[in-house]
Amino acid sequence: MARYVFITGGVVSSLGKGLASAALGALLQARGFSVRLRKLDPYLNVDPGTMSPFEHGEVFVTDDGAETDLDLGHYERFTGVSARKTDSVSSGRIYSNVLEKERRGDYLGKTIQVIPHVTNEIKDFLRVGEDEVDFMLCEIGGTVGDIEGLPFFEAIRQFAQDKPRGQCIFVHLTLLPYVSASGELKTKPTQHSVKELRSIGIAPDVLLLRSERAIPEKEREKIALFCNVRKEAVIAAYDLKTIYEAPLAYHREGLDQAVLDAFGISPAPKPNLDRWVDVMDRLENAEGEVRVAIVGKYTQLEDAYKSIAEALTHGGMANRTRVRAEWINAELFEREDPSPFLEGFHAILVPGGFGERGTEGKIRAAQYAREKGIPYLGICLGMQMAVIEAARNLAQVKDAGSEEFDHEVGKKRFTPVVYHLKEWIQGNHIVERKHDDDKGGTMRLGAYTAALTPGSRVSEIYHATEIEERHRHRYEVDVRYREALEGCGLTFSGMSPDGRLPEIVEIKDHPWFIGVQFHPELKSKPFAPHPLFADFVRAAVEVSRLV
């Protein structure tokens, strides 16, 4: 039976609950325990799949096809445990489930209320898989006091009461602001946050104090006294140069020991942190630097491409090289020649995205990389842009484009070398889609197998002829253009097992030019960099040595 750790936040949002949860999971693993991490989001969207990246950041896709919060990416990267659909839930999903049950008559005519029906649905979610691991770490999105979060706080209060004593603990992350006028760290916001938490029946066992300055011992004692928490369980959470320092930093501050003490686990197994020492060694002792241009649509918010940024960092670790990723808005290249902006870079990456805005700029970035011999990695839409560029400029399909960008019914602007995917094989059955389907949850989502051409560059990178990668797309390159494009040098080196869906393209006579329909960044880890990103950075290093 799993022990439960509930991680909550107070004072302000975006303090790093997700990273704290991931780091704690990694520390418990380092002591030999098995863990699973979950995220409970109070927003009313069913999932983040239809939310704007500017609103929410990236959507992290699991192997089983769930569209989830980017925090699940942190969970996977820090623990190596693949997330599942049952590891993410929102108020929208909870209320949807409750209403479906009401329509079916499952509640036998009772009046449906937040307590007990909504809270019971949340508790049912928490119980899934509780016999599989030693620790279940559950992060509650938002901050204590948010009106949307009240059912979740009530549910975890009830859940802790339902379990035997000592089976659940609460970790609360707050902010210690520094007031420069007085030269002091202020504890009142933390005290009031804990007071709010206690008013709804939850008493924190461990406090994490986010601070940009060293926390004096007297301030820790004061917080421990007024918040009714043991002083050893008042843990500093300082700003760090890199997120991958978090496990070692939290261990130095005693977070994992405080959690084990709260559960009464004594003597505690000693941690083996060699993995994280090696990660930090590779980051801090990089032997060079490469510049990678990320030409995208959502460049104003780096969280929109969070996993890509982290995967590039991992690729740098694999090569003991520092990767300096720089964001360029693709719309710039629709007005300007890309050459002056891109000539100082050692590699170019075009990430996934939706909609027509900026696509001509991405096509020009792909053309620049192809013609100048600069390493190019196109992901999802980035692969489609590379194919359209090759179709226009090599295969002489001058009006090549995507069905996604033909908005007017009956009026075609493009020859669609990229089309709306209406049918594909998933497992042992066929999935069918129509143009007028709902937007949410209707893409080709989750892990699918791809067959690689023996002897191709990608088969050498993967050291395999069959791979499994995660997808999130509803448009696909039309295989009918394969012969024409391969005749011009763009090889279809990865296909779906049935041979109908192109998964990877590459240019053989180019230093490094690869487009993939899937999202390799979602499977990269600091201690296990994704092979595509590792080799992409290696190619960038080679270019940097020629400059």
Curated annotation (Swiss-Prot):
Keywords annotated in UniProt: ATP-binding, Glutamine amidotransferase, Ligase, Magnesium, Metal-binding, Nucleotide-binding, Pyrimidine biosynthesis
| Protein EC | 6.3.4.2
Region of interest: Amidoligase domain: 1-265
Per the record's keyword annotation, is Isomerase included, yes or no? no
Q: Where is the Glutamine amidotransferase type-1 domain?
A: 291-546
* Listed GO CC annotations: cytosol
Q: In which pathway does it act?
A: Pyrimidine metabolism; CTP biosynthesis via de novo pathway; CTP from UDP: step 2/2
Which CDD domains does the record cross-reference, listed alphabetically? CTPS_N, GATase1_CTP_Synthase
UniProt-annotated binding residues for CTP: 13, 146-148, 186-191, 222
Q: Where does ATP bind?
A: 14-19, 71
Q: Where are the transmembrane segments?
A: none
Record: residues binding UTP: 13, 186-191, 222
Q: Which InterPro entries match?
A: Class_I_gatase-like, CTP_synthase, CTP_synthase_N, GATASE, GATase1_CTP_Synthase, P-loop_NTPase
Catalytic activity from the UniProt record? UTP + L-glutamine + ATP + H2O = CTP + L-glutamate + ADP + phosphate + 2 H(+); L-glutamine + H2O = L-glutamate + NH4(+); UTP + NH4(+) + ATP = CTP + ADP + phosphate + 2 H(+)
UniProt lists the family membership as follows: Belongs to the CTP synthase family.
Show the HAMAP family listed in the entry: PyrG (MF_01227)
Miscellaneous comment in the UniProt entry for this protein: CTPSs have evolved a hybrid strategy for distinguishing between UTP and CTP. The overlapping regions of the product feedback inhibitory and substrate sites recognize a common feature in both compounds, the triphosphate moiety. To differentiate isosteric substrate and product pyrimidine rings, an additional pocket far from the expected kinase/ligase catalytic site, specifically recognizes the cytosine and ribose portions of the product inhibitor.
Query: What subunit structure does UniProt give?
Result: Homotetramer.
The function of this protein is: Catalyzes the ATP-dependent amination of UTP to CTP with either L-glutamine or ammonia as the source of nitrogen. Regulates intracellular CTP levels through interactions with the four ribonucleotide triphosphates.
**Protein name listed in UniProt:** CTP synthase
Q: Which organism is it from?
A: Cereibacter sphaeroides (strain ATCC 17029 / ATH 2.4.9) (Rhodobacter sphaeroides)
